[in-house]
Amino acid sequence: MMPRLLFRAWPRCPSLVLGAPSRPLSAVSGPDDYLQHSIVPTMHYQDSLPRLPIPKLEDTMKRYLNAQKPLLDDSQFRRTEALCKNFETGVGKELHAHLLAQDKQNKHTSYISGPWFDMYLTARDSIVLNFNPFMAFNPDPKSEYNDQLTRATNLTVSAVRFLKTLQAGLLEPEVFHLNPSKSDTDAFKRLIRFVPPSLSWYGAYLVNAYPLDMSQYFRLFNSTRIPRPNRDELFTDTKARHLLVLRKGHFYVFDVLDQDGNIVNPLEIQAHLKYILSDSSPVPEFPVAYLTSENRDVWAELRQKLIFDGNEETLKKVDSAVFCLCLDDFPMKDLIHLSHTMLHGDGTNRWFDKSFNLIVAEDGTAAVHFEHSWGDGVAVLRFFNEVFRDSTQTPAITPQSQPAATNSSASVETLSFNLSGALKAGITAAKEKFDTTVKTLSIDSIQFQRGGKEFLKKKQLSPDAVAQLAFQMAFLRQYGQTVATYESCSTAAFKHGRTETIRPASIFTKRCSEAFVRDPSKHSVGELQHMMAECSKYHGQLTKEAAMGQGFDRHLYALRYLATARGLNLPELYLDPAYQQMNHNILSTSTLNSPAVSLGGFAPVVPDGFGIAYAVHDDWIGCNVSSYSGRNAREFLHCVQKCLEDIFDALEGKAIKT
């Protein structure tokens, strides 16, 4: 049996906040072109990864109904139950059989991979706020290294070293170790590298090590989402050697790899970035970057206008760049300012379509903002961790380093766009939409300092289950109801796995929340503790099922996708208001833990929802929440704080304060 993996990914537009490392990071090499020199090739396990299972239809129906119970009244539930029975014995049975047959014919991938790419790429909403999340780096532990030029140079060099290490197959394979004393050793690595790739996964399995899918990694670099009518496309050009830099809405490119594929001298990179930082040009009257925040069909049409007006070569340089480095010209005021800056900014200094934007503010605060269609949080977090560690432990330059004496004006190309009247009007319209939308977004955060993972584990409770219970209690306290809740879980243990949904709202969390919020005096502390234990046990079961590909959301989505692809009328199950309500995720939650991350976040996935990024640390709990004007994030966090206080009081044997 495979392990209970607790890797979280991002929801439709996922999240994160600081926590403990999910895996030991691999050994670091010296300051050369490579981060690591793994003796096991990076993709050694990829061919032998197990395939993502398709759940039994009857199991999916049971799990779906269990998730609906806390959201529906008796009459609504009976209707949904009847629709499920009809679906299971009728059209659902036929679709499931077709899905199984299709899966057998496509053993190179997973049943969800194609539909999931389509889900992202056919979405016409702006990718800003609706999809793209961010994660912010912790400051460099050595304060003098947080100078903007120093940090931008070191992060850039480390990112390119990651690229080189990945391309050379020298990056340690991503492996989840249940018994690292046996599997995460030089002796095991020397042995497993001689096992053929077609069998290597089984060799790791024998020592309780579980390699994870790494198919998304090749889209990290040189990649851009290109807007097209109806369906966007992902573009990658692995031959490109240049970096794209944005500052004050201006575009610059220069090579970070030479003609032989070696990393350009870090002092030259430092010189080029210093040259860009010294450019005193004002923000353009019509910043082209706003276009990447538009509706995708609108942007596709405007992009064609850009090409028609002679900007094709300029766009190619933008699209093929190794990545986009954004140099902001202001410091961070506080965590709220940081979240707004890294999640959306002012729209002038991000190319939202790039696989990722590496953002460095004037005070050295840095973050990764990434486009979501190409990959999930697991791949980005690995890159994030390695770059943070490399840039802080083996920095390419020091604060005392002198930039190379090179002619940056010849090496750095400033890109310019020819803009017709129609394009200028398009940029103006995009700016107005962008400004209007981001003004409606509120973000706030709390740090609950009374305890965290260590205390909860002593009480034999799942830390994640307790955090999710607090969100259920808080929403009940604020709005008096239980609503559809989404927690993302990675299925990277399988070939081309993406994510599965954990549904944290259950009959157990509803009962427990009502006891705490509505009538705590009617229950003894022992009864409250027992209810929390039930919640924890059930949440653990849901988490295990999701990580093993045994949720219900992706299966039902794939069946719906197949029905549409076959030209069938949408089965009645999908027209049920209960189904639509469940997929209107008012509470969208995600957690990714890393010692490199200071904060992360994402916007709500529905207008009346919350985007909840959180982490349970050893001795505190962090939560970063976003909302639009229809909800109140600050008030919600006050309720979360109160609910966590109540939970900890009950666990300590104290009466709940009303």
Swiss-Prot record:
Pathway per the UniProt entry: Lipid metabolism; fatty acid beta-oxidation
Compartmental location: Mitochondrion inner membrane
Modified residues (N6-succinyllysine): K69, K85, K239, K424, K439, K510, K544
Active-site residues, Swiss-Prot/TrEMBL: H372
Transmembrane segments: none
One GO MF term: carnitine O-octanoyltransferase activity
Enzyme class: transferase
Topology relative to the membrane: Peripheral membrane protein
Any single biological process term in GO: long-chain fatty acid transport
GO CC annotations on file: mitochondrial inner membrane; mitochondrion
Domain of life: Eukaryota
Transit peptide, residues from-to: 1-25
Binding locations of CoA: G452, K453, E454, F455, L456, K457, K458, K459, Q460, L461, S462, P463, D464
Family matches, as InterPro entries: Carn_acyl_trans, Carn_acyl_trans_N, CAT-like_dom_sf, Cho/carn_acyl_trans, Cho/carn_acyl_trans_2
Keywords: Acetylation, Acyltransferase, Fatty acid metabolism, Lipid metabolism, Membrane, Mitochondrion, Mitochondrion inner membrane, Transferase, Transit peptide, Transport
Modified sites of kind N6-acetyllysine: K239, K305, K510, K544
Pfam families in alphabetical order: Carn_acyltransf
Known EC number: 2.3.1.21
Catalytic activity: (R)-carnitine + hexadecanoyl-CoA = O-hexadecanoyl-(R)-carnitine + CoA; octanoyl-CoA + (R)-carnitine = O-octanoyl-(R)-carnitine + CoA; decanoyl-CoA + (R)-carnitine = O-decanoyl-(R)-carnitine + CoA; dodecanoyl-CoA + (R)-carnitine = O-dodecanoyl-R-carnitine + CoA
Sequence ranges on the Mitochondrial matrix membrane side: 26-178, 209-658
UniProt feature: intramembrane region: 179-208
Known role: Involved in the intramitochondrial synthesis of acylcarnitines from accumulated acyl-CoA metabolites. Reconverts acylcarnitines back into the respective acyl-CoA esters that can then undergo beta-oxidation, an essential step for the mitochondrial uptake of long-chain fatty acids and their subsequent beta-oxidation in the mitochondrion. Active with medium (C8-C12) and long-chain (C14-C18) acyl-CoA esters.
Family from the record: Belongs to the carnitine/choline acetyltransferase family.
Name of protein: Carnitine O-palmitoyltransferase 2, mitochondrial
Organism: Rattus norvegicus
Designated gene of the protein: Cpt2
